[in-house]
Design a protein with these regions (language model features):
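Cofactor-pocket helix-loop regions in the catalytic cores of large enzyme subunits
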Residues: 1-232, 255-383
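Short glycine-cluster motifs
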Residues: 234, 242-243
Length: 383
């Protein structure tokens, strides 16, 4: 049974669609389990190293900020329900700084005549800019010493670590002018409250955890956390256990048949290695001979796409994909099953930019032969 690998991710974000019935179905089968480590754990690990928690401020509190840094997030396009909150803050006089290696729709929304700014570091160099900002803040005595003394440890070590990261040095790495970095640091330390909004973009790249670990040091130095509208607002998945009892939906006690041992767990980020190794990427147990994919398109989203492609081309791999579209992954499937869209099924949805649970009510019946994820596994269990 461990030769079967269920492979899925967040899909349309519905909790039942993500983890409603599939763990029970594959758990009773004894199939390999999947460690969903490609999104979420990175940012949480990075912030916990600095803050001791993966949580941040409520994004809706950005309405009270006077300086908003949108760092690595195309908010106007991909987080549209938060944009009115940012616009409300701007009407109250807040300035907007967009930091992104790509000139996005959000970057185009800035207004330099009112003090907004677009800062465009080279890809993968954000950490150098953060270090230089901390260098300036400490050099110019702009730290909140009372906050640092009461709520942090390791200030001296951080001070020594950033001493060599001058704006000039960071400019050579990031491609951002030294004077821009200097002014950004001064603005961040002196305009209060200052809120940083970031999402999952950075964690999907090399050194993603270190991005968030370093970013977390900025509000700790300035004491931004002390004020409403100050701190870091990220995705709010870390609050999910406060919003809803997910175990009441997922029923983990129903996942294993009586007496069956716990199956092995495989890291979703290593799908290419798993599919091309006779022992599933060096783990104990058999190689993977059946791959069941839903809620994701790994050929487009998982590292080492060519290795995944090679694995999916194996003659001895049976692949089933439950999809709405003929994706890159679906093109390699032996069987493609039609999946419903978000508007065709009821579900419970947790938020990305606020602290309210959402109910997703179906607007139409499933089209033709398409079925929801929960219906798929219900039918398979009955078969």
């Amino acid at each position: 049974a461990e030769a079967v690998l269920p492979y899925s991710d967040a899909g349309n974000q519905g909790l039942l669609a993500m983890m409603g019935l599939n763990p029970r179905f594959f758990g009773h089968m004894g199939a390999s389990k999947l460690l969903r480590a490609i999104c979420g754990p990175t940012v949480g690990a990075g912030l916990r190293m600095t803050n001791g928690t993966g949580r941040g401020m409520d994004a809706l509190e950005l309405e009270h900020s006077q300086l908003i840094l949108l760092w690595g997030t195309n908010t106007k396009l991909t987080n549209r329900h938060l944009w009115p909150t940012i616009e409300a803050a701007r009407r109250r006089g807040a300035r907007l700084v967009v930091i992104d290696p790509i000139r996005t729709l959000t970057a185009d929304a800035i207004d330099e005549t009112r003090g907004d700014r677009f800062v465009q570091p080279l890809p993968g160099t954000d950490i150098a800019m953060m270090l230089a900002m901390m260098h300036v803040i400490i050099r110019d005595g702009l730290t909140d010493d009372a906050w640092v003394g009461a709520h942090t440890t390791g200030f001296e070590e951080l001070r020594d670590a950033v001493a060599g990261w001058t704006p000039s040095r960071a400019a050579e790495v990031t491609g951002v002018a030294a004077e821009v970095i200097e002014q950004l640091a001064l603005d961040y330390a002196t305009v209060r409250p200052a809120g940083i909004r970031t999402l999952i973009g950075a964690e999907h790249h090399e050194n993603g955890a270190m991005f968030f670990r370093t970013l977390g040091c900025l509000p700790a130095l300035t004491g931004a956390w002390a004020e409403r509208g100050g701190g870091i607002a990220k995705s709010v998945g870390s609050y999910s256990e406060d919003l809803i009892d997910v175990n009441a939906l997922f029923r983990p006690e129903l996942e294993r048949a009586g007496g069956r041992r716990e199956p092995r767990t495989l890291n979703m980020s290593l799908l290419g290695e798993i599919l091309t190794s006779p022992h599933a990427g060096g783990t104990d147990g058999p190689g993977i001979h059946a791959l069941i994919v839903w809620n994701c398109n790994p050929l487009a989203t998982v590292p080492r796409a060519e290795l995944i492609r090679r694995g999916m081309e194996r003659d001895d791999l049976f692949t089933v994909v439950h999809e709405q579209f003929l994706t890159d992954t679906a093109r390699y499937a032996d069987i493609v099953l039609p999946a419903t869209t978000q508007i065709e099924s009821d579900d419970v949805v947790l938020p990305w930019g606020h602290l309210w649970v959402g109910w997703n009510g179906a607007a139409i019946d499933p089209v033709a032969e398409s079925c929801s994820n929960t219906d798929l596994f219900r039918r398979l269990a009955h078969a």
